[in-house]
């Protein structure tokens, strides 16, 4: 449709296949309809379309919308397809692209897709946080904590679950921060140098639910940092999920800390006894996939000159897949975590394994016997080297003497330092493992969750208010085009 006046020959069929984005454009089909409606209303406001012309074009857009996206459209992309289909319905469709380029059109569609899916991801993360908080409230029992995947110090499962929570909490914050930067309108920037038509860009932005415009016309069409940032948000969230998924795999096997729900497990095609953590493994794998998308997007974007380049088209499928796939993954994770059964009889039994109370024993020597910490560390290290997981006072005194330190440690002090429950409860500092401190953190995070849900509703409401304005303006012309 666009080539006929400039090109003498049609595009090579294989080149056309390479250049076509129609396969992926279904992701922005409805957004493009909305962008077209907003642009038509802006043209009418500027006096470039009569009321009747605007009505006919919007009616045609409604018909195209109701007919749905077609992958067999013989067009290069969805933008050309919609314009061509509208023009078949009304000759006024030829005026729809006045004062506009596909450059600002596609950038607007992408921002609308990204903002909606960032909010979807943020909501899924909030649901996951809710699940983790509820699990933590009921899981104050002991478990071993790890460094280097080796038994390190005892902790509470509730404390461990809050670590998951706080990691994902930052992913929520990143999604909201990215949304605020994404939710700006490029519409009206045209190819890159703006347009000679007097078009109200702020009005167009409001119609589409944006909270402002990307002011500089060249920056508006030349920049895809919002695509990279959105994919990064997804990639970082998937990294968080992958770390938890890895522990689910580990804890459901030889550790025996958890029992996986049947709904999130599979069996073997040959070994009937198997109950495999396939879904957790797939969550783990998808982190690599989304991180790969991020790398691909950055490598496509790097060193592209200003302003628009067709290279950008190859970033779009990476954006679509990353946000949609991550949203699904977080939803699956939340559902799985909600149904996982923890086995406290096993976690509590293993909480003291690997001389997990060694640090407490060293701290006891410092606080009660005035031994410098580094020397206390050496004394307890000597006990560990002798594989004494439950040393007596005599063992401690002998190890100290070997290192040239004369102390007379009492049995009751050693026994208290080796008491796993007391060790965990003794850590009541800010962020620590004592039950009271964990309960305080749970209460604070429940309050934060409530505030975040309110914020999310507010942001969604602001977008909907803008789109309601668009729908109302279309209704004034006699067209109900709610998307």
Curated annotation (Swiss-Prot):
Its EC number is 4.3.2.1. It is an enzyme of class 4 (lyase). GO terms for molecular function: argininosuccinate lyase activity. Pfam families: ASL_C2, Lyase_1. One of its GO terms (biological process) is arginine biosynthetic process via ornithine. It is found in: Cytoplasm. Pathway: Amino-acid biosynthesis; L-arginine biosynthesis; L-arginine from L-ornithine and carbamoyl phosphate: step 3/3. This is Argininosuccinate lyase. It comes from Archaeoglobus fulgidus (strain ATCC 49558 / DSM 4304 / JCM 9628 / NBRC 100126 / VC-16). The lineage of its organism: Archaea, Methanobacteriati, Methanobacteriota, Archaeoglobi, Archaeoglobales.
